[in-house]
Structures are given as C-alpha cells and as structure tokens.
C-alpha cells in the first residue's frame, strides 16, 4: 500500500524525465538552441565536435538534451546516442535551401533505425528571422514528413537567437510525453 501511494504521489507531483536527442546538419543552430533553453541567453558557439548535454527543466519535466555535432564526418556517430531516446529534435536551417535535401536524407536515415522507432519527432525549423527562410509547410514537404505514417511528429518554426518557438516545441514534447 505504501508503495502505491508513493508511486501515485510521485506521478502527480514528481518531475518526469525525458531523454532528448538533438541533431541536424552543422550550423543549423542546435547548440544555440540548447543554451538558449538552458540559460535563457545566447552564447558564443563553435562547431560541436562530439556532444553537449544539459538538463532543461520545463513544466515539471526534466529534459536531458543531448546536442550532437552535425558535421558530415561525425554524423555516423549519431547512432551511439539513439538508445533510450524518447524524443528526437531535428534542427533544420530554414534559410539553407541548398542543403535541405541533405537534411531530408539524414533524417530519413535516422528514422529507419530500430532504436528510434518509439521516439517522437520534433523538427525545429530554425532561423525563421532570415528573409529567405522556408515556411513550415514548405519545409514539411521538402523533408518528406507527410509520408511518416507510424510516427508522431511536429514541425515548429523557431528563431534560436530570439528564442521564438522554442518553448512551443517543448510544450508539444511535454504533451506527447504525458500521453505515454
């Protein structure tokens, strides 16, 4: 009986944990997003070789966010971070029309991995402040997301430097986690 009451109490009042893997091509804004969420400010970043990991608490959920470098030479290492991932944040530079196909290919490759089959997908359509940025509907089309039938996904327009859209994305992740 004591365990049951304790379990109910922690379920109602305790923080839920969610492991998030944040990936995308190099220079998409992953590290800027991570530290904007963690610190509430913009930090000077350098290309990530390896990973950054931070805990972001939001709406009674403790997100452990793994930000993994996106240079083409280190993308094969992404698979080492797949295990136990509940949410996948794929960051796309919405202004980089020349590499959107490359983003689509990398995303589709990842989504075929068995270890990520249960992970929800949040796409951050970043750099929306740029004049040539693709809108959500265009990016959704170019990434081929409509073809994803057996996966829960969402595209959120963001601007990491201003912080716009980031918490809307976390709201969506929080909602999806609460349904599980």
Curated annotation (Swiss-Prot):
GO terms for cellular component: cytoplasm; Golgi apparatus; plasma membrane. One of its GO terms (molecular function) is GTP binding. Keywords: ER-Golgi transport, Golgi apparatus, GTP-binding, Lipoprotein, Myristate, Nucleotide-binding, Protein transport, Transport. It is found in: Golgi apparatus. Gene3D superfamilies: P-loop containing nucleotide triphosphate hydrolases. Pfam families: Arf. SMART domains: ARF, RAB, SAR. InterPro entries: Arf1-5-like, P-loop_NTPase, Small_GTP-bd, Small_GTPase_ARF, Small_GTPase_ARF/SAR. GTP-binding protein involved in protein trafficking; may modulate vesicle budding and uncoating within the Golgi apparatus. This is ADP-ribosylation factor 5. The gene is ARF5.
């Amino acid at each position: 009986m004591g365990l049951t009451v304790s379990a109910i109490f922690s379920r109602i009042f305790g923080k839920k944990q969610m492991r998030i893997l944040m990936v995308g091509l190099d220079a998409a804004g992953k590290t800027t997003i991570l530290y904007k969420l963690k610190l509430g400010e913009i930090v000077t970043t350098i290309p990530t070789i390896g990973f950054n990991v931070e805990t972001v608490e939001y709406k009674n959920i403790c997100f452990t966010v793994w930000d993994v470098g996106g240079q083409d030479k280190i993308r094969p290492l992404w698979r080492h971070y797949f295990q136990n991932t509940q949410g996948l944040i794929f960051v796309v530079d919405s202004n980089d029309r020349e590499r959107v196909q490359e983003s689509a290919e990398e995303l589709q490759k990842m989504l075929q991995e068995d270890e990520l089959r249960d992970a929800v997908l949040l796409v951050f359509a970043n750099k929306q402040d740029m004049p040539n940025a693709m809108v959500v509907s265009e990016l959704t089309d170019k990434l081929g997301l409509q073809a994803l039938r057996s996966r829960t996904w969402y595209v959120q327009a963001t601007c990491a430097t201003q912080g716009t859209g980031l918490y809307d994305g976390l709201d969506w992740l929080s909602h999806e986690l609460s349904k599980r």
